[in-house]
Amino acid sequence: ASDALLFVGAAGIAVRAIAPHVASKTTDPAGVAIDEAARFAVPLLSGHLGGANELAQTVARAAGAIPVITTATDVRGVWAVDTWARCAGLAVSNPEAIKRVSARLLSGGRVALYSDMPISGQPPEGVDIASDRARADIVVSPFAGANAGASVRAAETTGKVVPAGETGKPAGVRAQAPAPEPLRLVVPCIVAGIGCRRGACAEAIEEAFLLACGQAGISPSAVREAATIDVKAHEEGLLAFCRARNIPLATYPADELSQVEGSVSPSDFVRATVGVDNVCERAALADGGKLIFPKLAHGGVTVAFSKVTIELSFKER
């Protein structure tokens, strides 16, 4: 694990040390305790998303200890969707939904999974592949929004009997309530092509980026990299934006961008300035993706998005 806490000593001491700093299961690091005699390695925090269970097993193998795994899905041999998400590199938009998915699988039920990306391998026990995201319990997609994949599943509604007149339905008819929001797993398949004026600050780039994400309906965590022309490779505002977002910056020379295929919005001014008629759209397309959001200009910054295909696998690494 690249972000983990390993304690050598009593688990209780480790718990007291960790407790004041626990924030969220999506951001907390793995926490593992191993006793001084190297007999037991115990995951204490972030067993699935943080990888503490896996770390405990790794430490146990190295020290000749016994890993003490207590998470219900692992104990019962049930698929852990959050472990799969971590291994597949997917971000969790609404972690509160993990419990609902796991609870259904633990009770012997089934869940439907919809993915915008191909997934190789046999689905785990209890998981069905859905062709309609509106009927999915798990949605794997770069697109954001509370309604993404939202559904009303007639077989699992939890309505109550209401009197006539309140819903316009006859007395005794159950009012159908919407199903819970699906677990949304964000796949990092978006390339953000970015152009900017010289000296553009990180805040201006972030503002334009978030505006574009909102208009495109894209989760910001779906962006895998930023791309631009090579003359912007040392633009401090752009570099600071990428550092804050923890994404790489790909740069391309003007002659390479000019050969990128696809429909773009040409600009004579941009051509005269940097040698190619468009930066953001061509940079977004340079990695071979499909343009899904054309140029947005805001505050001296231009942003465009392309989507690349990423093949996922049900096999955990």
Predicted segments with their positions:
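N-terminal glycine-/serine-/threonine-rich phosphate-binding loop
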Residues: 1
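Conserved mixed alpha/beta catalytic, RNA-binding, or beta-rich assembly cores of soluble enzyme
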Residues: 4, 8-53, 58, 62, ...
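A polyampholytic, Gly/Pro-enriched intrinsically disordered region
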Residues: 51-60, 89-94, 267-281
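C-terminal edge-of-domain segments
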Residues: 136-145, 184-185, 281-317
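Low-complexity intrinsically disordered segments
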Residues: 154-155, 164
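C-terminal non-catalytic interaction/assembly regions of soluble proteins
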Residues: 210, 221-282, 288-291, 297-301, ...
